[in-house]
Amino acid sequence: MKTFVLHIFIFALVAFASASRDSAKKIGSQYDNYETCLTEHGLTDDDIFSIGEVSSGQHKTNHEDTELHKNGCVLQCMLEKDGLMSGADYDEEKMREDYIKETGTEPGDQRIEALNACMQETKDMEDKCDKSLLLVACVLAAEAVLADSNEGA
């Protein structure tokens, strides 16, 4: 019995460490064009917000508007290089397809509905950088809420 409890404790610790590690990652750092877009915008990895900071909304209160805008420009650059945006316009279908492929979601998954809602919420924004950051922040926040609600279920 002690061994079983120890295994559960270790599993929970590993799961927590994995989630913490992901939240410390920089937004977009897992994508091919990350370094290219940082260079194009004259930024370093230190200038980019962490996933945890964005998913919790802390990026809005902890940073100046210029930092928010610059982070959004890096995100927009990556989205454009991946064919998901052109200027300030989304390719909604391609964005859904890539999201499904990346997350392994199935039709009807709440995360797809969240992506759709986030695209709808930001679609009329004219500034491509602010629009990109708001979209990514919206999706990350929705994923965090859904993950929390699934843990409680």
UniProtKB/Swiss-Prot annotation:
* Subcellular localization: Secreted
**InterPro entries annotated for this entry?**
PBP/GOBP (IPR006170), PBP_GOBP_sf (IPR036728), Pheromone-bd_protein_Gp-9 (IPR022354)
Q: Does the record carry Transport as a key word? A: yes
Keywords linked to the UniProt accession: Behavior, Disulfide bond, Pheromone response, Pheromone-binding, Secreted, Signal, Transport
* Entry superkingdom: Eukaryota
The record, for Pfam families, names: PBP_GOBP
Report the GO molecular function annotations: pheromone binding
Q: Which GO terms describe its cellular component?
A: extracellular space
Question: An example of a Gene Ontology BP annotation on this entry?
Answer: social behavior
| Signal peptide positions on this chain | 1-19
Q: List the disulfide bonds.
A: 37-77, 73-129, 118-138
Main location class:
secreted
Instruction: Describe, as the record does, how this protein assembles with itself and its partners.
Output: Homodimer.
Question: Which family does the similarity line name?
Answer: Belongs to the PBP/GOBP family.
Q: What does this protein do, in the record's words?
A: Colony queen number, a major feature of social organization, is associated with worker genotype for Gp-9. Colonies are headed by either a single reproductive queen (monogyne form) or multiple queens (polygyne form). Differences in worker Gp-9 genotypes between social forms may cause differences in workers' abilities to recognize queens and regulate their numbers.
Q: What is this protein called?
A: Pheromone-binding protein Gp-9
Report which gene this protein is encoded by.
Answer: Gp-9
